[in-house]
């Protein structure tokens, strides 16, 4: 019994160490989404003032496209914006946007300063649509297939590595289906 009491703390320490090290094998950006391979949630967002088109679930069928959730107050959104712009400019994929919990005048000023690569922008003033999409924070980007199903989600800012290594190959695959 005495021997067990001396060995027990050591076993507990080793067990905690193994559990801790296993955590390093996981990608902290991988946040599971229950919406992967499911149809986009039903929604219909009005456009930002001065824009012709908002974004609705019906718009997300027929072509492979991205939906980017952004806000003018979001610092990582500014960092990823050139990447989103390059994706849209080179006709690689249409990009629609959900402007999350933002003042319209701030969003418009941000787009005027940084450029507007979006096919359409829906104003989600109260954040309700983002909740339905399972958004944890901004930015987040979703890849939508031709049938209007969410096929991939990037929580956090896009990076060239994510675009080249994951998004573009998946776009090519979805377009060939």
Give the predicted meaning of each segment.
Residues 1-46, 177:
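N-terminal targeting signals for export/organelle localization
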Residues 78-115, 125-131:
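Structural microenvironment flanking redox-active thiols in thiol-disulfide oxidoreductases
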Residues 68-73:
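Aromatic-flanked redox-active Cys/Sec active sites in thiol-based oxidoreductases
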Residues 112-117, 124-175:
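Thiol/disulfide oxidoreductase modules built on the thioredoxin-like
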Residues 24-26, 46-53, 121-124:
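Short gly/ser/thr-rich secondary-structure transition/capping motifs
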Residues 37, 42, 92-93, 118-119:
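A generic structural signal for alpha->beta connector loops
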Residues 43-66:
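A short beta-strand-turn-helix
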Residues 66-67, 95:
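Hydrophobic beta-strand anchors of alpha/beta hydrolase catalytic cores
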């Amino acid at each position: 019994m005495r021997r067990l009491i001396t060995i027990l703390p050591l076993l507990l320490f080793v067990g905690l160490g193994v559990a801790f090290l296993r955590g390093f094998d996981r990608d902290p950006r991988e946040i599971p989404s229950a919406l992967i391979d499911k149809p986009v949630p039903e929604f219909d967002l009005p456009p930002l003032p001065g824009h012709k088109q908002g974004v609705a679930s019906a718009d997300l069928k027929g072509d492979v496209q991205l939906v980017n959730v952004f806000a003018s107050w979001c610092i990582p959104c500014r960092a990823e914006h050139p990447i989103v712009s390059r994706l849209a400019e080179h006709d690689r994929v249409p990009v629609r946007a959900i402007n999350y919990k933002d003042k319209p005048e701030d969003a418009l000023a941000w787009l005027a300063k940084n450029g507007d690569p979006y096919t359409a922008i829906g104003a989600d003033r109260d954040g309700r649509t983002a909740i339905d999409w399972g958004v944890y924070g901004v930015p987040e980007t979703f890849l939508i297939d031709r049938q209007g199903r969410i096929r991939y989600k990037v929580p956090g800012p896009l990076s060239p590595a994510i675009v080249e290594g994951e998004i573009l190959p998946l776009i090519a695959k979805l377009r060939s289906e």
